[in-house]
Structures are given as C-alpha cells and as structure tokens.
Amino acid sequence: MKRLLFIAAAVIAIASPAAYAQVVRGDQIIAQSNFVNRQQAAIPQISIVVRADFVLFSVRYETATRSADARENELAQTFTTVTQRAARTQDITVEVGQPGVSAAIETAAIKELIQARGDDRSGIDIVLKVMVKSNETFDAVRARAEKFVKDAPLTGRVEAIIGDSQFLGVSEPKKHRETLIKAISEDVRLMQASFGGPASPVQVSLTGMEQRAQTRPVGPLDLEIYIPYSMSLRSGAGQ
C-alpha cells in the first residue's frame, strides 16, 4: 500500500540581499515560489521576466520501524528504487538534501544521508528537479512530481512526505545577466539624451553592477530577474 503524505514542511532557504528566499549557484538561480516577505524591497527600473526552466520539490522518506538496522535497510532500498526510477524518467532528476543545499546522489553514501528523528524514526531528504515543459502550468508540473512520488514502490513502513514549498529555477543565469546589462546600457543612453545635451552633458553613475543577478517570483512559473544596481545623474562635464 502506498503511503503518500502532504504536509507543511519546514522551509530551508537562503534569504537574498533583496529579501527574497533565493539561492544562487554557478549554473542556476533558484527562488522560493511561495515565499512571503512583509518588507518592501526596492527593485531597479530595469528587469526582465522569464519563465522558469525547472521546479524543485523537497521530498522526505521516513520510517518508524522499531529496529534501527531495519529502518536503515528500508530507507536504503527505497532510495535505490527512487533514484533508479528517476534515471528512467524523462525531465526528472534526483538530488540529496534540500532545495538550495542539495548535491548529486553520487556524492554521498546512503549511511551519511539517513537522519535519526527521535528514538524511533529515521528519514532521508531528497530533491526532485522537474523540468518545465513548453506551455505547461505549475499545477501540471506539480502533478508530475506527485505522480512520480506516488508511483515509486516503498519498502517496509517507509512513508513519502512532499513539502509544500517549491523553488522555481532558471538555468544559465549568465545569459540573463548579459541581457540585463544591455538593457541597462540602453537606459543610461536614454537618460543622457533626455536630460543632457551638447551645452549641458549629463554624467550617469552606476553602483552595484558587480553584484549577482537576483530574482523574485511574479507568477506561478515566472521569475523577475534584475541586478540590484542604483543610478545617479549629475549635470555638467565632470564639474
């Protein structure tokens, strides 16, 4: 009998300087899709909205079998089943850990992944990375994740628990940064043309351009990406 539970999981996230739950890795940017922040964050004028390339779901497998050795065996067998199933499933991959602090399954031994939860429960955390298909809705993406978890056979008393927090992600953030820089450059030229002239040139100064691109969710599968820069104008030719 399949045991699939949906609960409010504890959120493990990294807050970005812009006050949104965000994780930046070299090859991707991840933002928590249902993160709510009461603080007002200043968003620069220039930004772009892109569709998420993937969604991350946290899944916890737990067992309450009496024997600790039996619990470890159940979780090890379940983990093998899940990872092998993911290898055969298109557009779904598995990592160990939590969104933003996950790693490839090859980087850790199963004994290192199993965590004791009290005296009579043990568990293991994984991350499902589900690629977003063309014209797919968020509900459709989540349905695929839920089906993957539901259809994976479980060993012994293992239960599957899907967290209620998801992370939207974009791959290759470098290409989006290049798009932003070009747009900001055009905005600088517009400022100079609008407020200056041959007799009174305008100097435009930018600060913060060295920072990494930031994101915030603006739709079920949409992310706004921006560089947290600031702009200042000064009239006169260096005066």
Region spans (language model):
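Sec-dependent N-terminal signal peptides
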Residues: L4-A13
